[in-house]
A protein has these predicted regions:
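Alpha-helical transmembrane segments and immediately membrane-proximal extracytoplasmic
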Residues: 1-147
Length: 147
């Protein structure tokens, strides 16, 4: 069982790398491209803010991903690994082809798919999924209105 736990940690770290590879570039591209910040400063600032963010703004999104997609009592380490692997594969493929991608959406889809494959549709938390999908729809509309 220790080997499986270590494997899950390694897969989570790979997902984190893929997430940083994609999302960090999105967040710093403008300030680097316009020469407001040097690349080293932009990446350093991004790293610091990604670390500080959960302490300042909380972990509500992470809690929803952890408990609001699949029934938390039924999740196994294999579902976690499967969800992360699906998100890694999809994010890597889209990044390779230059397609716009949200790793958060990839993670939700990966966990949802692994949960359905391993436990069935009845173990999905539809209230949590409604919240997630509402955010996916509302956020771009809000950005369009405000921006």
């Amino acid at each position: 069982m220790l080997e499986i736990a270590i494997g899950a940690i390694i897969v989570a770290l790979i997902f984190d790398f893929v997430n940083g590879f994609n999302d960090s570039a999105n967040s710093v591209a403008t300030v680097i491209g316009t020469r407001v910040l040097k690349p080293i400063h932009a990446v350093g600032l991004s790293a610091i803010m990604n670390f500080v963010g959960p302490f300042v703004f909380g972990v509500a999104v992470a809690t929803t991903i952890a408990k609001g997609i699949v029934q938390p009592d039924d999740i196994t380490v294999y579902i976690i690994i499967g969800g992360l692997a699906g998100a890694i594969g999809w994010s890597t493929l889209c990044t390779y082809f230059g397609l716009p991608i949200s790793n958060s959406h990839s993670l939700v889809g990966g966990i949802m798919g692994a949960g359905i494959a391993g436990l069935g549709f009845e173990k999905l938390v539809y209230g949590g999924l409604t919240k997630v999908f509402a955010g996916i729809v509302i956020a771009p509309i809000g950005g369009l209105i405000v921006g």
